[in-house]
């Protein structure tokens, strides 16, 4: 799963050559990537409803917008944009931002792992 800012179509091609990729577009993506990817995506995996979006705004604004749009409507709401990890349960919804592989805004660069066995949970892995 990729939460936006793939940047170029060449990166998209490389990622999809490795495995199946579910992704949304981000604000830094080139037009050819934006034409192929939507800003929001909804999936059902492991019996759970998952919303994916890149997001916008600062940390508190992004989380507030995610809560308003998705709280108690999906099991997992995933977002990017802020480059700051978030892993919190609010109501029945897990809000998850894995941070950023590059250019972390706070702390270390990171990626995330989403677990869908039993109740959804997530990990932020610092690199």
Which residues does each predicted region cover?
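Active-site environment of divalent metal-dependent phosphoester hydrolases
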Residues: 7-11, 28-34, 57-62, 78-89, ...
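Binuclear metal-dependent phosphoesterase catalytic core
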Residues: 45-46, 72-74, 89, 96-127
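Active-site neighborhood of phospho(di)ester-bond hydrolases with catalytic His/Asp-centered motifs
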Residues: 1-5, 22-27, 52-54, 75-81, ...
